[in-house]
């Protein structure tokens, strides 16, 4: 939705519907996928498969792999979960390939669910959320795709996500949480560190980011 020029990532997040997500099942699934012959010169190797334990609201399986193309080895991490509250439903997304002049279609989260998951995290975690990429993503997605957001779907997705994570009680106090987050010295320092690390955020003020997040929340209340 954003593109590599706005924020790059070496990770893939996926959710599975209608299947068990355990280490053995995922190992078999990944082995089947990477063994498909496509003759593109890319080789995938699984290095490690483990349960995700670091973030309670994102239980699932993490696959650490490396890819090799033309002698260059690149690490790749894939997180697979199940039971995410995709609201109202997943959508087909056309993804343009980097090395071929064609696109492929994938099932993806709708924009409103992507925003809802990140917005819920900002509200419920408040000043304990150290993932500045969540804040940046909310801002850039609202700037690039704001006209495409359906308020009713955003509201439904936010409620569904909070219900699944057991954080509905925090939604009513979101404005106060936003004020606390914006004023917190540690959060400001984290944002400055993020700006120094990632040039795409260098000219983006903390206040501007938080204003975008407030606007998204108000849109969800329409």
Q: What are the residue ranges of the model-derived segments?
A:
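Structured mid-to-C-terminal alpha-helical surface segments
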Residues: 2-6, 12, 17-222
């Amino acid at each position: 939705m954003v593109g590599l020029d706005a924020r790059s990532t070496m990770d893939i997040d996926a959710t599975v519907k209608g299947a068990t997500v355990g280490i053995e099942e995922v190992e078999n699934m990944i082995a089947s996928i990477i063994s498909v012959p496509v003759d593109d010169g890319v080789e995938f190797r699984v290095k490690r498969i483990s349960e995700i334990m670091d973030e309670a609201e994102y239980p699932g399986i993490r696959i650490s792999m490396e890819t090799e193309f033309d002698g260059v080895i690149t690490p790749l991490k894939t997180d697979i979960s199940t039971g995410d509250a995709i609201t109202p439903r997943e959508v087909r997304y056309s993804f343009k390939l980097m090395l071929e002049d064609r696109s492929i279609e994938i099932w993806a989260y709708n924009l409103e669910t992507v925003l809802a998951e990140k917005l819920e995290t900002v509200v419920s975690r408040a000043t304990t959320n150290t993932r500045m990429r969540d804040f940046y993503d909310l801002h850039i997605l609202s700037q690039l795709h704001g006209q495409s957001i359906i308020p009713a779907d955003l509201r439904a997705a936010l409620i569904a996500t909070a219900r699944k994570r057991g954080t509905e009680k925090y939604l009513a106090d979101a404005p106060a949480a936003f004020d606390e987050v914006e004023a917190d010295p540690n959060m400001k320092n984290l944002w400055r560190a993020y700006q120094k690390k990632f040039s795409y955020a260098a000219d983006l003020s903390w206040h501007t980011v938080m204003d975008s997040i407030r606007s998204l929340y108000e849109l969800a209340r329409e």
